[in-house]
Amino acid sequence: MATQSKKTLYDFTVKDAKGNDVDLSVYKGKVVLIVNVASKCGLTNNSYDELNQIYLKYKEKGFEILAFPCNQFGQQEPGTNEEIVDFVCTKFKSEFPIFDKIDVNGENAAPVYEFLKTGFYGILGGDIQWNFSKFLVDKNGQPVDCYYPTTSPLTVERDIQKLLGLL
């Protein structure tokens, strides 16, 4: 009987903000920070500012941020994908990819988020708690840590450096 291999981030295909399929295997070999984002949250300004700082500092070293808009928390991401991308790219000058708006909890939760949450039930209580929850994924496509919404993206920098082999 063949042994089924362990799932990785690279086993998933998601939609970008324009509705095109993106095979996450394109991020193979990179350290990835995955964040559920919202435009009208109290955490928005600081989170995007710090995510941009980290992205610009490490993108050439094998680091990527994947942002997934989500409207499940306080209806704080009500816009269309086009409006969200325009907001993020205009106001914050973000260069990292913004994907299709998704659910991160419940029966319609995106499969990639079901995968990310596996193994972090004790920390998360089984569900994402709010906007700007963060998952750090290693170069092998395995989630290695998760961070609360209130955890500053800059606080995650040392963990990113370790996974990139910079420490």
From Swiss-Prot:
Active-site residue numbers: C41
Protein name, entry field: Glutathione peroxidase 1
Task: Cite the entry's keywords alphabetically.
Answer: Oxidoreductase, Peroxidase
Q: What is its EC number?
A: 1.11.1.9
User: Which PANTHER family does the record cross-reference, listed alphabetically?
Assistant: GLUTATHIONE PEROXIDASE
Catalysed reaction(s)?
Answer: 2 glutathione + H2O2 = glutathione disulfide + 2 H2O
- One GO molecular-function entry: glutathione peroxidase activity
Organism equals: Helianthus annuus (Common sunflower)
Gene Ontology biological process terms from the UniProt entry: response to oxidative stress
Q: Which InterPro entries does the annotation name?
A: Glutathione_peroxidase, GPX_AS, GPX_CS, Thioredoxin-like_sf, Thioredoxin_domain
Q: What task does this protein carry out?
A: May constitute a glutathione peroxidase-like protective system against oxidative stresses.
Record-stated family: Belongs to the glutathione peroxidase family.
Top-rank taxon: Eukaryota
Q: What class of enzyme is it?
A: oxidoreductase
